[in-house]
């Protein structure tokens, strides 16, 4: 696809996605019954001089069981400000870059709740190909939508914990975690400060010649970050992206950022998708949380 065709698809695609979000209230898809019992379990598994880690499970929408870890710092006054930390596609709540972030955040005084995305980590049920265009495309889409529900139920869990500050919840999502996080933070106003890393919008650009069909736009409508990103305002949004990202193209990140309302900021690193400078990325996220979680 040459650049002229790509720009044409982008221009028409933006109009199409905007039109769909106006006509169809896609955010209503993520409504659910808050009063359904969480049936949560919380078990202490690590206790050190600096922090505690709890193994957590809870009941989500569609009767799914979510597996998570809650880290709480010691020697800090409760209730703790809390960060929901979400991994990317194919990974789990204990993958190295999430472990790094967990340690970085609790050392800066935050509690951290990290969960396995739908059909990831301890929650794997099927191992089909994750592909928006393949024969398992609806199964793939359901992973995103279910994770959004799971994240909303994570906030329900936080609200039940006396040691966690339900009025100071941040979100830090990476790659697929950032894409699902854009939807989650758009539909759930209880998240005070979102940070989206390696996320982008206009997902129909992945569909080539089929990018502009009504079937494609209908299929993507409930997982298209462009349909939700405006709802984050007036909460402060930080995006962090790679200038050489080969998976979430920089153009997709720029489109998502442009669609977002102020207050917002975006930080770029000269990096590909899998070689972002982790410490700098988490440092910038922590600075954002320090400024706005008050």
Located regions from the model:
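Histidine-bearing beta->alpha loop at or near hydrolase active sites
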Residues: 269-276
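Short alpha-helix in the alpha/beta-hydrolase fold that links the catalytic acid
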Residues: 249-257
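Cap/lid segment of the alpha/beta-hydrolase catalytic domain
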Residues: 90-149, 206-209
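Short beta-strand/loop motif that positions the catalytic acidic residue
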Residues: 232, 238-241, 245
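Acidic catalytic loop of the alpha/beta-hydrolase fold
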Residues: 243-248, 275
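N-terminal cap/lid segment of alpha/beta-hydrolase-fold proteins
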Residues: 34-77
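Primarily recognizes the serine-hydrolase "nucleophile elbow" in alpha/beta-hydrolase
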Residues: 149-214
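Post-His helix in hydrolase/transferase enzymes
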Residues: 277-288
């Amino acid at each position: 696809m040459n650049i002229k065709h790509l720009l044409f698809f982008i221009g028409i695609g933006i109009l199409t996605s905007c039109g769909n979000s106006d006509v169809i209230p896609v955010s209503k898809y993520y409504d659910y019954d808050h009063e359904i019992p969480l049936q949560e379990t919380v078990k202490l598994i690590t206790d050190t001089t600096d922090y505690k880690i709890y193994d957590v499970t809870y009941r989500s929408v569609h009767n799914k069981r979510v597996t998570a870890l809650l880290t709480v710092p010691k020697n800090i006054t409760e209730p703790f400000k809390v960060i929901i930390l979400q991994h990317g596609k194919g990974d789990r709540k204990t993958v190295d870059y999430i472990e790094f972030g967990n340690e970085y955040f609790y050392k800066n005084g935050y509690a951290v709740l990290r969960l396995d995305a739908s059909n990831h980590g301890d929650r794997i049920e099927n191992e089909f190909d994750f592909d928006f265009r393949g024969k398992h495309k609806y199964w793939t889409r359901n992973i995103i939508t279910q994770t959004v529900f799971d994240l909303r139920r994570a906030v329900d869990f936080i609200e039940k914990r006396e040691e966690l500050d339900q009025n100071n919840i941040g979100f830090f999502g990476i790659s697929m975690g950032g894409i699902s996080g854009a939807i989650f933070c758009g539909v759930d106003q209880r998240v005070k400060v979102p940070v989206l890393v390696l996320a982008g919008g206009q997902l129909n650009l992945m569909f080539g010649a089929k990018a502009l069909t009504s079937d494609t736009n209908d299929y993507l409508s409930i997982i298209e970050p462009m349909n939700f990103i405006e709802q984050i305002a007036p909460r402060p949004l930080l995006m962090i992206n790679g200038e050489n990202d080969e998976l979430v193209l920089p153009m997709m990140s720029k489109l998502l950022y442009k669609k977002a309302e102020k207050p917002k900021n975006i930080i770029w690193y000269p990096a590909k998708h899998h070689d972002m400078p982790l410490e700098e990325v988490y440092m910038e996220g922590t600075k954002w949380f320090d400024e706005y979680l008050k």
